[in-house]
Amino acid sequence: ILNSRFSKEYDAIKDYFDSLDVSTIDAINTHYLEDFFFTITGKTKHEKPNDFETMKTWFCSHAGISLGEIEKVDQLYCICFQGKQGTGKTSLFRYLTPNVLKDYTKENLTDYENKDTKISLGENFLILLDELGESSKHDLIKLKSLITQKAVKERRPHAKRDTVLMRRAGFVGTFDKEQVFDDSAGNRRFIVIEIQKVEWSKLKEIPIDEIWKEAKFFYMNGAYNKSIDGMNTENNSKYEKTNPALEAIDNLYFTLDKNGNEFYTATEIQSHIEKEMRIRLNTKSIGEAMNKMGFEKVSKAIDGISLKRYKITAKVTKSEIAESKK
């Protein structure tokens, strides 16, 4: 009977969001999302405008997904609660789930590529990604791919053929480390909210239904920021792991100067850093670091040989760099 034509489709997630009455809400009197933000961060939306806007975007986007309108949602994100152990990050995940949807959550997700994980995208309201700080770089790459999926095609248990499942789940991550991400380029999918100390007595006074009702209202009226990649990249920079190439270039050797009059290839820079710092770096990491720091790369002929070179002002002389290549 499970897969017969007599089985009636029941969508608990959509039914819940359809039942949220937003007819009495107006933009002036909304405050539940702001109250939630203040209760978990200790800051107002005016004190941390970027953090509030990115958090609001996650709630509104997930309201759209829950209404079955994922194709209208431009970008998909994972909201992450960052804070010391014991601040209640995992409990916040459970708070975000309305009582009628308690059976539609998944915790302890570890394998980002197996069949059950992909099916869970179409069957759950929220998925917890606990302790992201312990994830490897390879795992985070797989996770970013999972976060961006809008639909999956898999064969459910007892089914005879594959089924296309539209994404329903939202991702909630937690971590306590301050260095989690390997690079800024792929971090825009993560919305990090720093948790100081959750005031649970006050949070209990904020009905989760009212928060999701506001999120639905803002989503339906397009009253949220749909382009937060830049804000995410800026916000998440402090959670990036130490980059040896960035440190060597930024702190020890070269300063950004738009009027720089010296030109060096990534290989020349590599040779000098390795000699002076006694660390081995590849030209790819050096190139990425130079580009991230804004150094201009131009075609420049030296001694009759035209190569792509970085325009810089060096804190060491040309002869010192030339000597390091010997």
Regions found by a protein language model. Give the residues of each.
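P-loop NTPase catalytic core of nucleic-acid-dependent motor ATPases
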Residues: 5-122, 267
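AAA+/SF3 P-loop NTPase mechanochemical coupling elements
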Residues: 117-122, 156-174
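Short glycine-/polar-rich loops that comprise or flank the Walker A/P-loop
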Residues: 123-125, 167-170, 185-191
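Conserved catalytic/switch belt of AAA+ P-loop NTPases
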Residues: 140-163
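A short helix-turn-beta junction within AAA+ P-loop NTPase domains corresponding to the substrate/partner-engaging
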Residues: 181-200
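Long, low-complexity, charged/polar intrinsically disordered regions in eukaryotic proteins
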Residues: 204-237
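Conserved AAA+/SF3 P-loop NTPase catalytic/coupling segment centered on the Walker-B
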Residues: 125-148, 181-186
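DNA transaction DNA-binding modules
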Residues: 226-326
